[in-house]
Amino acid sequence: MGIHPLTSRCAGRTALVTGSSRGLGKAIAQRLAAEGATVALTGRTMDPDPKYQGSLRETLAEIEATGGSAIAVQADLSHTEDRERLFAEVVDRIGTPDILVNNAAVTFLRPLADFPERRVRLMMEMHVLAPLHLTQLSIPAMRERRRGWVLNVTSVGGDLPGGPPFDDFDRNAGFGVYGTVKAALNRLTKSLAAELYDDGIAVNAAAPSQPVATPGAGTLDLAKTDTEDIELITQTALELCTGDPATLTGRIAHTQPFLREIGWLS
């Protein structure tokens, strides 16, 4: 995470960030905590494990070492019961979230002709149903406060590809199901933003304009593509999780053009 001036933009607020043991979720959780939020971390990896890069305990320790406030709750968000248990524990320990960041994901890349149905269902569960369910659980308290922010972490892979002619990536990379679930998440974001607008709840999505070199990017050959600094997604997330819900909602924000639009990036 880069060095940021402390502005306390999230002081007094609580945030739930899914998939925060590593990668984008970890970086977003750290940024919100640095801005004063009390952050609930969640993911499947609670303790350090040599099979994985990062764990909830490590993220928690790093936040607390810099003076931030956080808790860690292990959960497998592919299961309805785990989502409900997670949310209940977060409410019990730090209160209902003012900010919900739906970042947890699972990715399999394979041609559609032989893509296993069980993996399609798992990706739909993680990328679409889990964000919807956690948002549904968050809505009552946000409505009562007439204030709330929901951020769905999406991907430029959710954009419709051009063609014909189709480029080599779209023909051969096996991104069909991934792009489908991210496109569905984008549509869900727009619909939630419209339905919750009168309640003062902002719902947005954010995507890196280019791949970010994190442990979660292991399926990509980053040596063959341009990458961007993780600070761009953390800044985008901060803006979308603190902006005025009357004007900053319903956005599918790609980091670089969005940050140029608001004057943060030249």
Language model features with spans:
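Conserved glycine-rich Rossmann-like NAD(P)H-binding loop of the short-chain dehydrogenase/reductase
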Residues: 35-58
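C-terminal helical subdomain
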Residues: 183, 198-199, 205-206, 222-266
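Catalytic loop of short-chain dehydrogenase/reductase
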Residues: 151-184, 189-198, 210-212
